[in-house]
Amino acid sequence: MSTPLPTQDPPDIPEVLPILPLNNVVLFPGMFLPLVVSGDTWVKLVDEAALATKMVGVFMRTQPGEGFDPLALARTGAVALIVRMLRLPHGAVQILVQGQARIQIRQLIVTEPYPQARVAIHRDPAVLSVEVSGLARAALAAFQQIIQLSPTLPDELAIVAANTAQPGMLADLIAANLNLKPEDQQLVLDTLDVQERLRQVLSFLEREREILTIGRKAQEEMSKSQREYVLRQQLEAIKRELGETDDHAAEIAELRRRLEAANLPEEARKEAEREISRLERMPPGAAEYVVARTYLDWLLDLPWNVSTEDNLDLTQARQVLDEDHYDLERIKERIIEYLAVRKLRLEQDASGSARGPILCFVGPPGVGKTSLGTSIARALGRKFVRVALGGVRDEAEIRGHRRTYIGALPGRIIQGINRAGSNNPVFMLDEVDKLSVGFQGDPAAALLEVLDPEQNVAFVDRYLDVPFDLSRALFICTANRSDTIPPALLDRMELLELAGYTEMEKLEICRRYLIQRQRNEQGLAERAPTITEAALRRLIREYTHEAGVRDLERRIGAIYRKMATRAAEGQPLPDQVDAPDLDDLLGPPRFRSETLLGEDEVGVVTGLAWTPTGGDVLFVEASVVPGNGQLTLTGQLGDVMKESARAALTYARSRARALNIPTDFAQICDIHIHVPAGAVPKDGPSAGITMASALISALTDRRAYKHVAMTGEITLRGKVLPIGGVKEKVLAAQRAGVRTVLLPKANAPDLRELPEETRQQIDIVLVEHMDEVLPRVLHPKSESVTLAEPAPPDGAGTVQAT
């Protein structure tokens, strides 16, 4: 209850007052009002006002908020006298204020540290007309009647109102205690003319009296058995008399308005209408109410017909792609082709639309697969959505959960579309090769419908249970390897392989992207020293050994962190970082190509392997010792690799005479083939010619050239069969310092994928038979060998010549 001040002389009000905005609260002159003030600005205002005049100007905000906006303040406020102040925890202050007079802002003087303004003070005139007195009596009588009808207004309020001599203050008292909206109370406060103010209050009193009369009648008709029902009827009657609808009806009306604006497809629209009708008949307290409302929110919020316009300027799109990524020409061309097709179709038919291709980027970590998706979205002018699928084992993550489950939601595909806000985003499915199969189903199988151009026109999420058109989206998948992707899923995607970068490409990427990015991230910007080309080359060769550039960027970041530490300590920074400085900044080198290859040895041959992280150099060792013909294979070899070793042994036996090897070596010797890095599992057929070369090197006591690397499958007749991963393997050979690479002749078309720089640095020899391999791998030796004598201690593992 708000009560007026006792009659006393009004205090002197300063012309300049601090301004305190209020949310949904109106203070009338002569009334008490408790306030809780928080926020550093407003607490400071109250503290300083309490020490000075104890007066502040309070105005209601027309739009609730936290800051100060003079345009968002009501036209009229009140002078508030601080009567009592109490500090609360967390820095807030509780104050009790008394309204003194109406004020209006004439001029805003300052806004910092808190707003202060020059105000105009409005007081009610002392002498009033007879008409005003009559209106005041009518208002008092109506107010006393409402106090009798209302269960919330105390009877003492009638005495206070009767003792209020000033008509203007009586109007303020009534407006402060009636159940009015803040906007209606502000309307009374804005009315400076007392007569007009009383008329407004009388209209509010009449409305309140009608409401209370309806309530009294409803209460009189109430019985025990009908209590709950009648209470609802009473509320509805009040709302109808006010010309308002209840919250439930307003919510239904809002849903219907959103349905009209959403422009849903026919099937989705019918489902939404059915669900809204069901919701309309359901009481808001029902358990199913929230479930149905959440479903409708998803259905109406989805961008069924909201699309972003494609950027069809091919030159600009190409420029954006080149800005973000170096090289990757094949992928860039594929995106430009899609844009070109889209542009031509639109020229033929304005409503025509090309279905988005479903691309799959396969390559080792750090080559830019994920970041390429963002670049493609920017080039196309589309929204970008990324969903990480690594470790997902429940197909409901893709297809959504049925609404019968508690907490059910749509799958990640529909959630991503909703997050994008358009039905044609660039949608990246990251790490699609790392999906898991669990007892909840196979998520890879669930992706078949998403990624099939013939089916995703009407993709049905289990939660929505209505078709949604995914064909406008441009789906991009990423994977480190394609052999772990189910064949049916792989068949629906256009595979684009991203091999590792060459040294020159890494240098260019460093210059264009990595160095500047790390400078900014480490807080150096333009103060950072330049890293010379020699230092970058040494970084690439001796401190990293990867197909991508992720570790290289980490090393560059480590260099600039050292420089940032020096700068923070006030030490001078060098102008540049050169190759010799890397030992102090990064420690000793981690890799050395010359150490990796080493000296030519008997029984040790350099092979090439493909791994999910790119190509790698693989050494195969073979030793021959006296024994009874036992073959030992070590190094965690898979079944295919073991079969390659047996095929190599059979080939060596069949060619023993031609190779000047005793034909009975398989009966008098034990053979041990080992592939180092024994803790790492290895498999695949491409090490066949490498194993055969190592075995023949050991049997003939001929050293093998370490700078010659090879890959290829071998048959029992010595033919060299094609293999995969040619580009990755050749790039790995280049990183290791290999000078010659032997490849199956059938892989000749794959050489077109190699960078020109690689073809110039490495001598690539195409072979069809082991007879072409051995002369290029083994040192020449004319002597024959004898295998029956035991090998001396210093020659263990080799066959001595006789």
UniProtKB/Swiss-Prot annotation:
UniProt key word Signal: no
Record's catalysed reaction(s): Hydrolysis of proteins in presence of ATP
Keywords associated with the record: ATP-binding, Cytoplasm, Hydrolase, Nucleotide-binding, Protease, Serine protease, Stress response
InterPro entries: AAA+_ATPase, ATPase_AAA_core, Lon_bac, Lon_bac/euk-typ, Lon_lid, Lon_proteolytic, Lon_Prtase, Lon_prtase_N
Annotated ATP binding sites: 363-370
Subcellular location field: Cytoplasm
An annotated Gene Ontology molecular function: ATP-dependent peptidase activity
Induction and repression of expression: By heat shock.
Record-annotated active site: 686, 729
Matches recorded under SMART domains: AAA (SM00382), LON (SM00464)
Record-linked Gene3D superfamilies: 1.10.8.60, 1.20.5.5270, 1.20.58.1480, 3.30.230.10, LON domain-like (2.30.130.40), P-loop containing nucleotide triphosphate hydrolases (3.40.50.300)
EC number: 3.4.21.53
Enzyme's top EC category: hydrolase
GO CC annotation: cytoplasm
Major site of localization recorded for this protein: cytoplasm
PANTHER family for the chain: ATP DEPENDENT LON PROTEASE FAMILY MEMBER
Quaternary data: Homohexamer. Organized in a ring with a central cavity.
Family to which this protein belongs: Belongs to the peptidase S16 family.
Described function: ATP-dependent serine protease that mediates the selective degradation of mutant and abnormal proteins as well as certain short-lived regulatory proteins. Required for cellular homeostasis and for survival from DNA damage and developmental changes induced by stress. Degrades polypeptides processively to yield small peptide fragments that are 5 to 10 amino acids long. Binds to DNA in a double-stranded, site-specific manner.
Protein name in UniProt: Lon protease
